[in-house]
Design a protein with these regions (language model features):
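Intrinsically disordered, low-complexity, charged/polar segments
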Residues: 47-124
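Short, solvent-exposed secondary-structure boundary/capping segments
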Residues: 37-45
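Mixed-charge, Lys/Arg-rich low-complexity intrinsically disordered regions
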Residues: 1-12
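Glycine-centered tight beta-turn/hairpin loop motif at sheet-sheet or coil-to-beta transitions
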Residues: 22-24, 47
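Small side chains
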Residues: 19, 30, 41, 57, ...
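Tryptophan-anchored aromatic micro-motifs
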Residues: 12-21
Length: 124
């Protein structure tokens, strides 16, 4: 069985993964940069920046990467478009642009069962 460090080491810029916050919140994250020690990611739905330890997959706040399973191409594309949409539009000025499309809803519904059925090995 491959250990979690091996899976985490393979993550690269542009990939999407799932993490969980200590309160159980789902964090759909896009890798924005990597170095030997850290993996920097942005939450797609909130645009929060997170820094994960590359060895453990944890943030200083206790968020933990729990799945790095690749998404089907179309789902990945829709989530990248959603990330871009949330980057360029201001919800206070253009709230109508933040309404989810049917494709975006479908992609977000797909994520939970997909990542839940493809977990990383637990921390040792």
């Amino acid at each position: 069985m491959t250990d979690r460090k091996s899976f985490l080491a393979k993550l690269d810029v542009g990939e999407i993964f799932h993490a969980e916050a200590p309160n159980g919140a789902s964090l759909i994250c896009l890798v924005v940069s990597v170095d030997e020690a850290n993996l920097r990611a942005r939450r797609i739905t909130s645009q929060d920046d997170l820094v994960f330890n590359r060895q453990s997959g944890m943030t200083a706040d206790g968020d933990i990467i729990d799945s790095v399973a690749p998404l089907p191409g179309e789902i990945h594309k829709v989530l990248l478009e959603l990330d871009r949409k949330y980057q360029i539009y201001d919800p206070n000025k253009e709230p109508e642009r933040f309404r989810l499309t049917e494709e975006e809803k479908k992609a977000l519904r797909f994520v939970k069962p997909h990542y839940s059925s493809n977990p990383l090995p637990p921390l040792p």
